[in-house]
């Protein structure tokens, strides 16, 4: 059985980084303490995605980290990923739950209390909540207010991961007390020292 207990630091990959470089960066993040990796690859061919996902899954296995695939359930199944992460425009959660193995982890991006309740009811294991800050990784991201974050926290019985423009320096007490962890792209992958940046995040998240 896969351990679905939440982990605090969650890396989402950046498809704009050449894959060999991304693999090295991901390894550094795992050494630093990242415990979930989500493979996100927009506009890539399925064959290429399967190849890359397989390599990342192998790397995650070496570190005992969970490996999830964004959106593409077919790719997740092909490489025996630990689960998937789906957005509001992707497959319905209950359908994903029917297709994926019984112990698969299913994460869902939500933007308000109603979406959170629906995802939980349909079988989500964790929620990505945001965007908490402006981000270059998603052009159409709408910022979430602290009030909305608190509303989601009040109805959720599963882990919440903050997403969107998160750095070690903008995670204040009000935000942290409503999250179980954070999902990060740029703040880790664009860092000069990914390993140390991961540890910096974990230090803040552990307070």
From Swiss-Prot:
Binding-site positions, 2-[(2R,5Z)-2-carboxy-4-methylthiazol-5(2H)-ylidene]ethyl phosphate: 135-137, 165, 185-186
Binding site for Mg(2+): 71, 90
Enzyme class: transferase
Pfam families xref list: TMP-TENI (PF02581)
Residues reported in the UniProt entry to bind 4-amino-2-methyl-5-(diphosphooxymethyl)pyrimidine: 38-42, 70, 109, 138
Key words, A-Z: Magnesium, Metal-binding, Thiamine biosynthesis, Transferase
Domain of life: Bacteria
Pathway participation: Cofactor biosynthesis; thiamine diphosphate biosynthesis; thiamine phosphate from 4-amino-2-methyl-5-diphosphomethylpyrimidine and 4-methyl-5-(2-phosphoethyl)-thiazole: step 1/1
InterPro entries in UniProt: Aldolase_TIM, ThiamineP_synth_sf, ThiamineP_synth_TenI, TMP_synthase
Gene Ontology biological process terms in this record: thiamine biosynthetic process; thiamine diphosphate biosynthetic process
Record-annotated membrane-spanning stretches: none
Bound cofactor: record note: Binds 1 Mg(2+) ion per subunit.
Keyword Membrane annotated: no
GO cellular component: cytoplasm
Keyword S-adenosyl-L-methionine: no
Cofactor: Mg(2+)
Chemical reaction(s) catalysed: 2-[(2R,5Z)-2-carboxy-4-methylthiazol-5(2H)-ylidene]ethyl phosphate + 4-amino-2-methyl-5-(diphosphooxymethyl)pyrimidine + 2 H(+) = thiamine phosphate + CO2 + diphosphate; 2-(2-carboxy-4-methylthiazol-5-yl)ethyl phosphate + 4-amino-2-methyl-5-(diphosphooxymethyl)pyrimidine + 2 H(+) = thiamine phosphate + CO2 + diphosphate; 4-methyl-5-(2-phosphooxyethyl)-thiazole + 4-amino-2-methyl-5-(diphosphooxymethyl)pyrimidine + H(+) = thiamine phosphate + diphosphate
Molecular function, one GO term: magnesium ion binding
E.C. number(s) listed in UniProt: 2.5.1.3
Entry function: Condenses 4-methyl-5-(beta-hydroxyethyl)thiazole monophosphate (THZ-P) and 2-methyl-4-amino-5-hydroxymethyl pyrimidine pyrophosphate (HMP-PP) to form thiamine monophosphate (TMP).
Recorded family membership: Belongs to the thiamine-phosphate synthase family.
Protein known as: Thiamine-phosphate synthase
Species: Clostridium perfringens (strain ATCC 13124 / DSM 756 / JCM 1290 / NCIMB 6125 / NCTC 8237 / Type A)
Gene: thiE
């Amino acid at each position: 059985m896969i351990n679905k207990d939440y982990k605090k630091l969650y890396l989402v990959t950046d498809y704009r980084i050449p894959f060999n470089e991304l693999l090295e960066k991901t390894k550094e993040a795992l050494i630093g303490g990242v415990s979930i990796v989500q493979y996100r690859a927009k506009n890539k061919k399925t064959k290429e995605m399967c190849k890359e996902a397989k390599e990342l899954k192998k790397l995650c296995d070496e570190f005992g980290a969970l490996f999830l695939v964004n959106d593409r359930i077919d790719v997740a199944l092909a490489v025996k990923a630990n689960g998937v992460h789906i957005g509001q425009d992707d497959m319905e959660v209950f359908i994903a739950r029917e297709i994926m193995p019984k112990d698969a982890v299913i994460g869902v991006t939500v933007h308000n209390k109603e979406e959170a309740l629906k995802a939980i009811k349909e079988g989500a294991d964790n929620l990505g909540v945001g965007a908490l800050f402006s981000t270059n990784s998603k052009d159409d991201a709408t910022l979430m207010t602290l009030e909305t974050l608190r509303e989601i926290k009040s109805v959720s019985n599963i882990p919440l991961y903050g997403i969107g423009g998160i750095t070690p320096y903008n995670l204040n007490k009000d935000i942290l007390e409503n999250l179980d962890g954070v999902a990060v792209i740029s703040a880790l992958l664009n860092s000069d020292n990914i390993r140390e940046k991961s540890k910096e995040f974990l230090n803040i998240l552990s307070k």
